[in-house]
Amino acid sequence: GIPCAESCVYIPCTITALLGCKCKDQVCYN
């Protein structure tokens, strides 16, 4: 997928989650 410029190591995807991004390998991907 496309990296969403947000990490999800300590907290889940927040802003980018609204854009359909999901956590994968500690990084939010679209």
UniProtKB/Swiss-Prot annotation:
It holds the Pfam family Cyclotide. It comes from Oldenlandia affinis. This is Kalata-B17. There is a cross-link at residues 1-30 (Cyclopeptide (Gly-Asn)). Disulfide bonds join 4-21, 8-23, 13-28. GO terms for biological process: defense response. Belongs to the cyclotide family. Bracelet subfamily. Probably participates in a plant defense mechanism.
